[in-house]
A protein has these predicted regions:
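Glycine-rich FAD pyrophosphate-binding loop
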Residues: 30-50
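Active-site substrate-recognition segment that forms the wall
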Residues: 198-232
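Conserved mid-domain beta->alpha element of the FAD-binding
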Residues: 15-31, 39, 154-155, 260-341, ...
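C-terminal helical "tail/cap" subdomain of flavin- and related membrane-associated enzymes
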Residues: 2-11, 73, 80, 99, ...
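Histidine-centered metal-chelating micro-motifs
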Residues: 161, 180-182, 208-211, 286-287
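Flavin-binding catalytic cores
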Residues: 232-263, 326
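Conserved N-terminal helical subregion
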Residues: 3-13, 30, 55-167, 171-188, ...
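Conserved Rossmann-like nucleotide-cofactor binding loop
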Residues: 21, 44, 160
Length: 381
């Protein structure tokens, strides 16, 4: 519990959002001696989505936060990514550099690990607590009318951030042509016997994709990706018959799909600035991107950790926030560009898309661009 005495003797942060960005910022600031209170509007910490890839860059952040061991416990060490067409022919194979770690994990496990470490460092996590706006002088305005004063307000409240919008920070917000339904299913004994869980398979058929990713010894993460205009494809509960028509060789897998998925359309967001006065914006609220290289959470955690690092080195808030954005934003925007670019084939004719995917898997330049973020050493690690 953060006491009034703590707030008076330490620099104090009010953080909005209990996802990757908010929890990473909370843990990192607490490690630097801040008093921290985190607000999550939901009654529990439950992330959107089901599974997630965490690459070397994100794993370094988790290590720094003390959450690494618990976050990746039981998760497969990912080593191979295949792309296949509607006839199950392999279009490309990418084998990750074994010296750079990649884990496919259950999102909830990572969130729980980060929250546990944040609490150990003194962070107060308040559930069912909704913030609706902030002021540049560091005041957080709550849905119940309270106004909470802080040295720093951090907005990690997602793509529809009320804090960001209250400060008029959006430069560009663009819905993308595709989206995804994400679910978790049980991993069968046959699947467990046939594979170590380290191979991810992305199956393409027209503009539809089925991503198959083991995330534990007993669970598989499935992402169904389709054009937003594909009303049948994005329907929840999932229209199994329609997906079987697209992927007949995956009929047995599709029969195992559960009905509790959620559809989300991908978006791109770019801000005028990552901060306004004493308010910093993190995660999807600042730089939403499609998941085509699996770095949404990675960028969020890197930027959260580096925010605490710059604030610790430079006591002047304005200078610290300006330096943070100047140094960290280029890598994030590279990640956004390459993620959007790799989503373009979704709208292309099948022959053109097949040729691109085959070429992209062989191009050293393309591989270097898509792995640049994963190979980046996060500031503060």
């Amino acid at each position: 519990m953060t006491t009034r005495k703590d707030m008076q003797s330490k620099r104090h942060a009010e953080i909005v959002g209990g996802g990757f960005a908010g929890l990473a910022a909370a843990g990192a600031l607490a490690q630097k001696g801040w008093s921290v209170r985190l607000h999550e509007r939901s009654p529990e910490l439950r992330p959107t989505g089901a599974g997630i890839y965490i690459y070397e860059n994100g794993l370094r952040v988790l290590e720094k936060l003390g959450a690494y061991d618990e976050a990746v416990k039981g998760a497969p060490f990912a080593h191979t990514r295949e792309m296949r067409d509607e006839q199950n022919r392999v279009l490309s194979v990418h084998r990750w550099d074994p010296s750079k770690r990649v884990f496919s994990v259950v999102r909830q496990r990572v969130i729980n690990a980060m929250a546990d470490e944040a609490r150990k460092n003194g962070v107060e996590i308040v559930l069912g607590s909704e913030a609706v706006a902030a002021t540049p002088d560091g005041e957080l305005i709550m849905a119940d009318g309270r106004r909470l004063k802080a040295d720093l307000v951090v907005a990690g409240d997602g793509i529809n951030s009320k804090i960001r919008d209250s400060l008029n920070l959006i430069a560009k917000r663009r819905p993308l042509p595709d989206g995804a339904v994400r679910i978790m299913i049980d991993r069968t004994p046959q699947e467990r016997a046939a594979s170590d869980g380290g191979t991810t398979i992305e199956n393409w058929s027209g503009s539809r994709r089925i991503l198959y990713t083991p995330v534990s010894d007993t669970e598989v993460y499935i992402a169904l990706t389709m054009l937003h205009s594909d009303e049948v494809g994005r329907r929840v509960p999932i229209e199994r018959a329609s997906w079987k028509q697209s992927f007949p060789h995956l009929s047995d897998l599709i029969d195992r799909f559960v009905d509790n998925g959620q559809y989300g359309r991908f978006e791109y967001i770019r801000l005028k600035s990552w901060s306004a006065g004493r308010v910093a914006i993190l995660g999807d609220a600042a730089h939403a991107l499609p998941p085509n290289i699996g770095q949404g959470a990675g960028c969020s955690m890197m930027n959260a950790l580096s925010l605490a690092w710059y604030l610790d080195r430079e006591k002047d808030m304005a200078t610290a926030l300006r330096t943070w954005e100047t140094n960290e934003r280029p890598m994030t925007e590279h990640t956004q560009r390459i993620s959007v670019f790799l989503g373009l084939p979704t709208t292309w004719p099948t022959p053109m898309r097949r040729a691109f995917l085959t070429l992209a898997g062989k191009s050293k330049w393309m591989v270097a661009q898509r792995t640049k973020t994963a190979r980046h050493i996060p500031t503060g690690t």
